[in-house]
């Protein structure tokens, strides 16, 4: 009975690690995709893989936040209705808050600098 429980536990750990590895691979692929698209200012194609990385693995890279600002600013400019504008703007403000959560202690861009950038965008 003990060996059956041990076997079940080992199988559960094995499958859990495979799922985690697959998610990591998916995050890496999407991170690479959105980064390359954003570098050439193809924000339309960058948006979907960026959203996947932003929601599924938000601490994977600081580029999620630095390039995310550019992607969302593009999305704001593309808005054709007030609702689209408001949704994209709210998402941009949340992006700044999330950057503070995951990278607020970064010496290159500390929390006060992120808040200053957020305030500047908010007052535009």
State each model region's role.
Residues 1-25, 69:
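Bacterial Sec-dependent N-terminal signal peptides
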Residues 2-5, 99, 118:
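Basic side chains
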Residues 14-15, 34, 74, 85, ...:
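Phenylalanine-focused residue identity feature
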Residues 21-25, 34, 38, 46-48, ...:
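Structured catalytic/translocation cores of nucleotide/phosphate-coupled proteins
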Residues 23-35, 58-78, 104-124:
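Amphipathic alpha-helical repeat scaffolds of TPR domains
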Residues 38-51, 84-97:
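Helix-turn-helix repeat elements of alpha-solenoid scaffolds
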Residues 79-83:
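Short, polar/flexible loop-turn hinges at active-site or ligand-entry regions and domain interfaces
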């Amino acid at each position: 009975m003990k060996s059956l429980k041990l076997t079940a536990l080992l199988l559960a750990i094995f499958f859990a690690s495979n799922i985690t590895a697959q998610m990591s691979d998916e995050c890496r692929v999407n991170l690479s995709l959105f980064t390359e698209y954003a570098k050439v200012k193809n924000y339309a194609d960058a948006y979907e893989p960026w959203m996947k990385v932003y929601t599924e693995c938000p601490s994977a890279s600081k580029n999620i936040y630095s390039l995310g600002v550019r992607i969302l600013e593009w999305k704001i400019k593309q808005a054709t209705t007030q609702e689209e504008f408001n949704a994209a703007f709210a998402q941009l403000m949340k992006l700044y808050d999330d950057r503070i959560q995951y990278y607020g202690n970064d010496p290159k861009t500390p929390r006060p600098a992120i808040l200053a950038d957020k305030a500047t965008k908010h007052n535009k």
